[in-house]
């Protein structure tokens, strides 16, 4: 018989009744039923109930004193449970093991957190003792699912003829939207490597090396603040690049990969292929966001022109000063009590809005705080444009376009939540396309890239040459796209710029000289000069896919050893100070914050 086990704790069934077995695992739960002592033994595969009979009173006394999570090995006979004691909640619930002997393999100290799920410890404790936290069923299953999802993604890519690559982790710094993690070079004092924010340049170079289809389960490193859906430090993505493809070719690959993965690991309904395509401008108008949550059926409308024709003097004055008016419908809420509308007004003020107007289309006529300013013809226009019917209400926000867009998005979400019309058992996918190539950084009043600087502008170099004003530049669209699910951006992607003259021009507009471009992107620019194929790609985030599949509230629930929101690894105690010897080898010296100032 094997030293530790003949079976796992999750595989025993009625087919094993009568067998002598050996099991090893963690002492999970204990119940003393007066003469009979029951122990739940847990391993990676499941839970089995152990029985210590009353003819082993000395053994019962010993095992009763052992702390939870002690590792033990037991021998015993598999027996069927009586009908009234069958446990349908576990896979081994039809049987139990009557123990004849046991050995303690490793004692556990008093636990800093409970494993059995009776209450959840503070996150700081969970992260500090992550090896204990990972024993809990939910987190343990999430990590197992992570492995299965990655395997599924890999299998689908291989079946589509892709080649898996591994690109360098130590590379050069490049401006990709976030701060780099820098690694000092011992052999080249004063110089630094950077951990890759993404394998962007390498995967494009792979296309220029004559390969046709690239993928990688890629680690990415970005020194940025944490969010619920973003881990500080590192994350993983399914990095994809293809040669000789159009935007629709990329969509045609990615849609079945995501659809099949979500179908395999969830019983929720999923958007049918092809996924809807929504332009960036339409998304910002209809949903107030470039990450639309299509589970919420409410769509925002622009009613500025109609309000311009009304008798609402105050808002007309605001419109004349550059404001816009957005309408947010509230289906079947016209007869809601006044408290509903007051609550929404207070919420809008909390968001920074000066107020929130509304109209109610009741069966008894039109009511609401601003109904008196509109004649029947204008009300009919509003109703038609916003696609409302009797029984609906409409909220209105008036402000500068950016502010109105942000507030309208929040009001849309709040109305959907209050009316309980946001579906929770589905995955709603869409593509957001035609992103602006450039954006205006209002803080420094300067043109910057809106997304990936390596994307292809629609219209090519002619679009740059025709642009005479800042507004012209901001109107240039890129072959850039995002895949969004339930309001979560799973990935950005683009058809790449593969022409040197176009690359220099694109960077010159944001202030880069030719020498600076050559210095930062020399390898890629050189490759462009030796026959670069048209190419494009995308990189769905694996952590975010898992967040959606597990209904996790934050990304740390799908990562085995995550950092906290302050970018600290509480388990390993990092970031940490290093020795003077290490600094000397790197020819580095620490200076105080006061001296930096």
Curated annotation (Swiss-Prot):
Its main location: cytoplasm. GO terms for cellular component: cytoplasm. It catalyses: tRNA(Asx) + L-aspartate + ATP = L-aspartyl-tRNA(Asx) + AMP + diphosphate. The record marks 33 as: Important for tRNA non-discrimination. Its EC number is 6.1.1.23. One of its GO terms (biological process) is aspartyl-tRNA aminoacylation. The keyword Cytoplasm applies. It holds the Pfam family tRNA-synt_2. Keywords: Aminoacyl-tRNA synthetase, ATP-binding, Cytoplasm, Ligase, Nucleotide-binding, Protein biosynthesis. Residues 200-203 are annotated as: Aspartate. L-aspartate binds at residues 176, 222, 451, 496. One of its GO terms (molecular function) is aspartate-tRNA(Asn) ligase activity. ATP binds at residues 222-224, 489, 541-544. It is found in: Cytoplasm. Aspartyl-tRNA synthetase with relaxed tRNA specificity since it is able to aspartylate not only its cognate tRNA(Asp) but also tRNA(Asn). Reaction proceeds in two steps: L-aspartate is first activated by ATP to form Asp-AMP and then transferred to the acceptor end of tRNA(Asp/Asn). Homodimer. Belongs to the class-II aminoacyl-tRNA synthetase family. Type 1 subfamily. HAMAP family: Asp_tRNA_synth_type1 (MF_00044). NCBIfam families: aspS_bact (TIGR00459), PRK00476.1 (NF001750). PANTHER family: ASPARTATE--TRNA LIGASE, MITOCHONDRIAL, ASPARTYL/LYSYL-TRNA SYNTHETASE. This is Aspartate--tRNA(Asp/Asn) ligase.
């Amino acid at each position: 018989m094997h030293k530790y086990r003949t079976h796992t704790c999750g595989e025993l069934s009625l087919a094993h009744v009568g067998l002598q077995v050996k099991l090893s695992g963690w002492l999970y739960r204990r119940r003393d039923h007066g003469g009979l002592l029951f122990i739940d033994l847990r391993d990676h595969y499941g839970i089995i109930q152990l029985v210590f009979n009353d003819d082993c009173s000395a053994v019962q006394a010993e095992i009763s004193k052992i702390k939870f999570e002690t590792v033990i090995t037991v021998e015993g006979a598999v027996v069927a449970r009586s009908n009234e004691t069958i446990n349908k909640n576990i896979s081994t619930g039809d049987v139990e093991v009557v123990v004849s002997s046991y050995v303690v393999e490793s004692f556990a100290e008093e636990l800093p957190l409970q494993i059995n799920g009776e209450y959840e410890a503070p996150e700081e404790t969970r992260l500090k003792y992550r090896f204990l936290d990972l024993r809990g069923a939910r987190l343990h299953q999430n990590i197992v699912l992570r492995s299965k999802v990655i395997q599924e993604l890999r299998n689908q890519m291989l079946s589509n003829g892709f080649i898996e690559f591994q690109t360098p982790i130590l590379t050069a710094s490049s401006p990709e939207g976030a701060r780099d993690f820098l690694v000092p070079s011992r052999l080249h004092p004063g110089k630094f490597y950077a951990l890759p924010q993404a394998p962007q340049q390498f995967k494009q170079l792979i296309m220029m090396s004559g390969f046709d289809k690239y993928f990688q389960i890629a680690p990415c490193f970005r020194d940025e603040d944490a969010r619920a859906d973003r881990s500080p430090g590192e994350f993983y993505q399914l990095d994809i690049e293809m040669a000789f493809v159009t935007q629709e070719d990329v969509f045609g690959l990615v849609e079945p990969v995501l659809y099949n993965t979500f179908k395999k690991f969830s019983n929720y309904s999923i958007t049918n292929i092809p996924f809807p395509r929504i332009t960036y401008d339409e998304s910002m108008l209809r949903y107030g966001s470039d990450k639309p949550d299509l589970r919420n059926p409410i769509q925002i409308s622009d009613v500025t022109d109609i309000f311009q024709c009304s008798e609402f003097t105050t808002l007309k004055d605001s419109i004349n000063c550059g404001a816009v008016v957005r309408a947010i419908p509230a289906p079947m809420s016209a007869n809601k009590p006044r408290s509903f509308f007051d609550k929404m007004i207070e919420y809008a003020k909390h968001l920074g809005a000066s107020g929130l107007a509304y109209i109610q289309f009741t069966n008894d006529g039109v009511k609401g705080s601003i109904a008196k300013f509109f004649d029947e013809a204008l009300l009919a226009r509003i109703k038609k444009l916003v696609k409302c019917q009797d029984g609906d209400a409409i909220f209105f926000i008036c402000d500068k376009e950016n502010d109105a867009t942000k507030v309208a998005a929040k009001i849309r979400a709040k109305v959907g939540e209050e009316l309980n019309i946001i579906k929770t058992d589905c995955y709603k996918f869409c593509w957001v396309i035609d992103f602006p190539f450039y954006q205006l950084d209002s803080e420094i009043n300067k043109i910057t890239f809106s997304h990936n600087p390596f994307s292809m502008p629609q219209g090519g170099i002619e679009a740059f040459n025709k642009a005479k004003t800042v507004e012209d530049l901001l109107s240039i669209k890129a072959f850039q796209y995002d895949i969004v699910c339930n309001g979560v951006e799973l990935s950005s992607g683009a058809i790449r710029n593969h022409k040197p003259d176009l690359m220099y021009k694109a960077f010159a507009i944001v202030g880069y000289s030719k020498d600076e471009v050559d210095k930062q992107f020399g390898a890629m620019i050189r490759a462009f000069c030796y026959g670069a194929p048209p190419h494009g790609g995308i990189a769905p985030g694996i952590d975010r896919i898992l967040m959606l599949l597990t209904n996790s509230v934050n990304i740390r629930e799908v990562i085995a050893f995550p950092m906290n929101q302050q970018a600290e690894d509480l388990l390993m105690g990092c970031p940490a100070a290093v020795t003077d010897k290490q600094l000397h080898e790197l020819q580095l010296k620490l200076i105080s914050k006061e001296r930096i100032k």
